[in-house]
């Protein structure tokens, strides 16, 4: 077995198709294998195109493997540019989004990346719809668990607000050599996201995709039965429960109930004026339902010799597993891209992205909270409603609190305008200028609603809160980034030289204002102006600037001997001025 130059290929895999029989080639490229006369051999070797060869009764075969030029020429996105995968000297992983996305019903880029790249750990912060995830590269390497720097088209951005269908590829820079070009902010690695662009000389096309999926818990905690729970009270030496029930009496009632529950059709017994709960309940199942999720995406694109364009719109609608629609997430994405080759040496590009999201989750400041109560309350805790002094009141189960409480609402808007200008003075040199404006706003509202309920443990009427409270928080961030850099690439015989150098400037301003007030006049219309309690206000503001110079030099001899150096010098307003 040889290559196109007649050199023997050592260690190529040779397997009989459809069988487990196989071998590898030796130092001279030879192999010996017993096969049927009509066998087909599958031959594979890294960097070469796989082949299937028919034996056809022959005793000797001469096989020539061709180099897989597609693999050898594949490029990977790195800091401020691309490099041939074969010429990489640092630890870089790269994936094409279309290859890992497929038809998976995912709502965010973070979901897609779970398990998709070696060394990248994606961890969920919660199970609520639309919850953000955290990234970690090569494990935790500091006590603060620093996060990697995430860049979208060379600029910082929250990838959770991107539609996965708008992403072309993702590269992860894992080591210091690869991420040094981004300075100290890249100490925990870098995630580079490249979005989809229009393609020249392509016909107008429309693409539409959707996904529908259902969700439910795969495994829930199992609680002790009422009999086991009360027996545990007795084993601990408890004579009377905290609300007065006699433990021995309770045990006898439970044994009788387990033998013949029809004697207590209401699921409880009243002895000496004290209520004994007997029926086993499941608070977790009571507060859950089957979740439903749908995603839609439509895109149009095309181009001629000088202009290319792409536009897309996407929608995510996710209802969680908790009862009612107070456990939900909706997101709308719009993206527009255009590129024009005004002249052979100048190319402007414009990319505008907008995302709007709205999420709701059950909110209560009551003790335990929704999930805490579902786990902590015993399995004899009653469900539904209870009559107390002639008044029908909801019991303080998680199900009822979800229904009666107001949800915590989170509204986000994210506008990103990205402009790029590429100038090519001559063949081997490109000068690139990029400007990005990113405006992010968020409004968070919470309302502690006051309502009466029956406590399922002490059977008394209580209030959810002493005073209703309405709170609204507004955040706004304006981010500006400017990059200008030049790439020079030259090939001289077997020598390949690449030089890149540039300047980066970023500014970020953040403002937050929060206000709250208690004692709503109308619980159904919470508002700061429709309340009688005291105001409580607070605000925050932050501003910083970063400027940096960066470079990268690559050298390759005959594609076999590689040398790369890169670095960055930064100045930041976060540090005090030194002289």
Language-model-derived ranges and their functions:
Residues 577-579:
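Short glycine/threonine-rich loop-to-helix capping motif typified by GTGT followed
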Residues 106, 293, 304-305, 339-347, ...:
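Outer-membrane beta-barrel channels and translocator barrels
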Residues 96-100, 352-356, 568-574:
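Conserved short loop/turn motifs at secondary-structure junctions
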Residues 1-335, 347-349, 416:
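Short, small/polar-rich motifs associated with maturation and membrane association
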Residues 481, 548-552, 560-562:
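Short glycine-rich loop/turn motifs
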Residues 201-280, 316, 320-416, 432-547, ...:
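Surface-exposed loop/interface segments of Gram-negative outer-membrane beta-barrel transport/assembly proteins
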């Amino acid at each position: 077995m040889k290559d196109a130059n007649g050199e023997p290929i050592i260690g190529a895999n040779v397997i009989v198709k459809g069988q487990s029989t196989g071998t590898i080639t030796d130092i001279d490229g030879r192999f010996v294998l017993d096969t049927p006369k009509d066998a087909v051999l599958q031959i594979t070797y890294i960097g070469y195109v796989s082949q299937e060869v028919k034996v056809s009764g022959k005793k000797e075969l001469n096989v020539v493997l061709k180099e897989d030029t597609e693999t050898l020429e594949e490029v990977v996105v790195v800091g401020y540019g691309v490099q041939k995968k074969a010429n990489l000297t640092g630890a870089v992983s790269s994936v094409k989004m279309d290859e890992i996305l497929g038809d998976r019903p995912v709502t965010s880029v973070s979901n897609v990346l779970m398990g998709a790249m070696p060394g990248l750990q994606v961890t969920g912060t919660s199970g609520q719809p639309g919850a953000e995830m955290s990234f970690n590269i090569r494990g935790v390497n500091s006590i603060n668990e620093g996060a990697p720097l995430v860049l979208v088209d060379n600029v910082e951005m929250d990838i959770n607000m991107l539609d996965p269908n708008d992403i072309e590829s993702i590269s992860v820079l894992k080591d210091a050599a690869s991420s040094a070009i981004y300075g100290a902010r890249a100490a925990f690695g870098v995630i580079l996201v490249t979005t989809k662009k229009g393609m020249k000389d392509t016909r107008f096309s429309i693409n539409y995709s959707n996904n529908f999926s259902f969700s439910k818990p795969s495994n829930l905690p199992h609680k002790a039965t009422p009999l086991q729970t009360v027996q545990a009270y007795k084993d601990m030496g408890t004579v009377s429960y905290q609300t007065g029930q006699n433990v021995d009496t309770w045990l006898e009632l439970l044994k009788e109930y387990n033998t013949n529950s029809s004697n207590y059709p209401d699921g409880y017994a009243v002895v000496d004026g004290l209520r004994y709960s007997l029926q086993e309940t499941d608070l977790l199942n009571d507060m859950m339902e089957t979740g439903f999720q749908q995603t839609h995406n439509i895109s149009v694109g095309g181009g001629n010799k000088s202009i290319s364009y792409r536009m897309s719109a996407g929608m995510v609608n996710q209802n969680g597993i908790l009862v009612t629609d107070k456990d939900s997430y909706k997101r709308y994405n719009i993206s527009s891209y255009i590129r024009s080759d005004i002249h052979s040496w100048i190319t402007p590009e414009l990319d505008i992205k907008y995302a709007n999201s709205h999420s709701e989750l059950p909110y209560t400041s009551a003790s335990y909270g929704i999930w805490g109560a579902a786990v902590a309350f015993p399995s004899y805790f009653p469900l539904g409603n209870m009559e107390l002094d002639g008044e029908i009141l909801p019991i303080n189960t998680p199900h009822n609190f979800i229904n009666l409480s107001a949800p915590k609402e989170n509204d986000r808007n994210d506008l990103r305008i990205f402009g790029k200008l590429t100038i090519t003075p001559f063949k081997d040199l490109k000068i690139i200028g990029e400007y990005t404006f990113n405006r992010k706003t968020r409004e968070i509202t919470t309302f502690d609603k006051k309502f009466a309920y029956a406590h399922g443990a002490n059977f008394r009427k209580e209030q959810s809160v002493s005073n209703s409270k309405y709170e609204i928080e507004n955040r706004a961030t304006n981010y500006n980034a400017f990059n200008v850099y030049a790439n020079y690439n030259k090939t001289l015989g077997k020598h390949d030289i690449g030089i890149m150098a540039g300047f980066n400037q970023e500014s970020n301003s953040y403002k937050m204002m929060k206000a709250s007030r208690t004692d709503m006049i109308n619980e159904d219309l919470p508002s700061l102006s429709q309340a009688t309690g005291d105001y409580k206000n607070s605000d925050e503001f932050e501003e910083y600037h970063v400027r940096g110079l960066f470079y990268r030099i690559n050298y390759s001899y005959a594609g076999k001997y590689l040398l790369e150096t890169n670095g960055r010098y930064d100045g930041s307003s976060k540090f005090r001025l030194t002289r």
